[in-house]
Amino acid sequence: MLNKSVARRYAEAFFSIARETGKVDELQQELEKLVSIIETTENLPEYFAHLLIPAKAKKEVANKLFGGQVSQLTLNFLNMIIDKRRETYIGLISEEYRDMADELRNITKAELTAAAPVSEADMKNLEQNLSAKTGKTVQLSLKVDPGLIGGLKIRIGDQIVDATVAKKLEMLKEQLKQAKIS
């Protein structure tokens, strides 16, 4: 199990450099490109994760693979990660970096859970309403849960709005338990 706080520290360091150089977007794209290539190339994730392969050999492979595709700054960052034996964290580092960049851009992610698919128009309408309420640009993703009887649930960060039928029935049950019969 990878430690998210370790990934966050590396992402913060790289993000700090990106802000100083004014290259937040560019370096985010490069980091995501690195992760994509590593994760989709056969045997490459295992190669970078292998503890018996020396860091020098891994850095040579990284320099050959990514030398012309990313900036020297991103390549130096990857080499530093390899030196510190944190190459398995590159995916998590990229996610943490993306979260920091989104925060800088005033973007927040939200997840809508519904019993059935929701139309694109309804998704856009809900995104706009949530954006107005939060004061941030909301990027809404849909999760279909056929187990829901009806209604929907929205999660924004650590807040949950539960408007499912199951939740309403649970609240009604509690009200009935507390009602005094005379």
Curated annotation (Swiss-Prot):
Protein name from the UniProt record: ATP synthase subunit delta
A Pfam family it matches: OSCP
* Keyword set includes Ion transport: yes
Question: Is tRNA-binding given among the entry's keywords?
Answer: no
**What InterPro entries does the record tag this protein with?**
ATP_synth_OSCP/delta_N_sf, ATPase_OSCP/dsu
Question: Where does it sit, as one GO cellular component term?
Answer: proton-transporting ATP synthase complex
Q: What gene is it encoded by?
A: atpH
Q: What is its biological role?
A: F(1)F(0) ATP synthase produces ATP from ADP in the presence of a proton or sodium gradient. F-type ATPases consist of two structural domains, F(1) containing the extramembraneous catalytic core and F(0) containing the membrane proton channel, linked together by a central stalk and a peripheral stalk. During catalysis, ATP synthesis in the catalytic domain of F(1) is coupled via a rotary mechanism of the central stalk subunits to proton translocation.
Q: What is its main location?
A: membrane
Give membrane topology per the record: Peripheral membrane protein
Where does the protein end up? Cell membrane
Q: Which UniProt keywords apply?
A: ATP synthesis, Cell membrane, CF(1), Hydrogen ion transport, Ion transport, Membrane, Transport
Task: Give the family from UniProt.
Answer: Belongs to the ATPase delta chain family.
Q: Which GO terms describe its molecular function?
A: proton-transporting ATP synthase activity, rotational mechanism
Q: How does it assemble?
A: F-type ATPases have 2 components, F(1) - the catalytic core - and F(0) - the membrane proton channel. F(1) has five subunits: alpha(3), beta(3), gamma(1), delta(1), epsilon(1). F(0) has three main subunits: a(1), b(2) and c(10-14). The alpha and beta chains form an alternating ring which encloses part of the gamma chain. F(1) is attached to F(0) by a central stalk formed by the gamma and epsilon chains, while a peripheral stalk is formed by the delta and b chains.
